Amino acid sequence: DIRTAFPGIRGFSVRSLRYMAKFAREVESEFCSDYCRIPWGHVMKLLDKTEPGERREWYLAAAVENGWSQAVLDHQIDLRLYERQQVAGKVTNFERTLPSPDSELAQQTLKDPYIFDFITAKQSAKEHDIEEQMVSNVTKLLLELGTGFAFMGRQYHLSVGSEDFYIDLLFYNTKLRCYVVIELKNEKFKPEFTGQLGFYVAAVDGEVAGEYDNPTVGLLLCKSKDDAVAEYSLRNVDAPIGVSEYRLGDELPPEYENILPSPEDLMNRI
């Protein structure tokens, strides 16, 4: 009897023993120490929701690096973060406009699509309405943007020459060590969007960024995009820009609808 062999040690319920057996079957011995860096509840979640292999190891590493709670780990698996952060299929010009390894890190940081499940808005909603909800839920926004993002401001004012300009959202990323300009478009991608964002990126480089900051990166978030059109639009753009789609809470595809906790429930458990 296990309880007799290990008196005073708890956690040997039938359920836990089944997870222990599954862990022994599926986790190779050289990786066991990695799993010791997260609580047992996290391990059970990984065993439940992922198969052995690269995808599971990616979520394990992300949970350790970011200090995710069990609720956040569960949420990120449900939102398919691993799939959304894969480099293949992302529309950027980072490889051409940023030095290595910054280009690879920026590419890895980008997601497509972004899932803003904490925002509900009508189809006809204005961009500033969506921005307001983002800023009102800035903790959730930062969670979706990913590691290292710090919020600098909404409608961030830039004075260039004798004119005034306002950036939708400005962030600083401590991993990239650069400013990130986000422009939000509540419509399908258009080629002219890259010109405006390219100007904002250049202006932040010239007016805001410091001597030791890396080149500013631009992120254009659109309701939808034609990848071929977006790729051609970036081909001759010198500013580092990525183009991604985004989804709001009332626009999630069917596979997400029944698996997500409410934003309130998620944040109460973080």
How would you label these PLM feature ranges?
Residues 1-270:
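Basic, low-complexity intrinsically disordered segments
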